Amino acid sequence: MATYSLANERLRALEDIEREIGAILQNAGTVILELSKEKTNERLLDRQAAAFTASVQHVEAELSAQIRYLTQVATGQPHEGSSYSSRKDCQMALKRVDYARLKLSDVARTCEQMLEN
């Protein structure tokens, strides 16, 4: 049950980030609209620029926290979608078996030659 709670909390955090990105875009739009006017309201521009900067920093921090969490969760478990390591181990084992067969056949040949003499 705690796992679902943690997952729901993570999803809520991502939804908050999404809303914050919407606010960032809205702030940017307001600034662009204000800049397109002949006479701009400096205080409005300053407030919107400060809100934009604060929102971007908040989104960056939250996304970094989400990425750190996902990295911590993922590093403790093998990547299930990749079989490269297993295939490579199998290929190396087959090469060792072939090499052992080659050496055993050399030993057998040497033994047969010694018995013939």
Swiss-Prot record:
Pfam families: Med11. It comes from the Eukaryota. GO terms for molecular function: transcription coregulator activity; ubiquitin protein ligase activity. The keyword Protease does not apply. The modification N-acetylalanine is found at A2. Its main location: nucleus. Keywords: Acetylation, Activator, Disease variant, Epilepsy, Neurodegeneration, Nucleus, Transcription, Transcription regulation. Component of the Mediator complex, which is composed of MED1, MED4, MED6, MED7, MED8, MED9, MED10, MED11, MED12, MED13, MED13L, MED14, MED15, MED16, MED17, MED18, MED19, MED20, MED21, MED22, MED23, MED24, MED25, MED26, MED27, MED29, MED30, MED31, CCNC, CDK8 and CDC2L6/CDK11. The MED12, MED13, CCNC and CDK8 subunits form a distinct module termed the CDK8 module. Mediator containing the CDK8 module is less active than Mediator lacking this module in supporting transcriptional activation. Belongs to the Mediator complex subunit 11 family. Component of the Mediator complex, a coactivator involved in the regulated transcription of nearly all RNA polymerase II-dependent genes. Mediator functions as a bridge to convey information from gene-specific regulatory proteins to the basal RNA polymerase II transcription machinery. Mediator is recruited to promoters by direct interactions with regulatory proteins and serves as a scaffold for theee assembly of a functional pre-initiation complex with RNA polymerase II and the general transcription factors. This is Mediator of RNA polymerase II transcription subunit 11. The lineage of its organism: Eukaryota, Metazoa, Chordata, Craniata, Vertebrata.
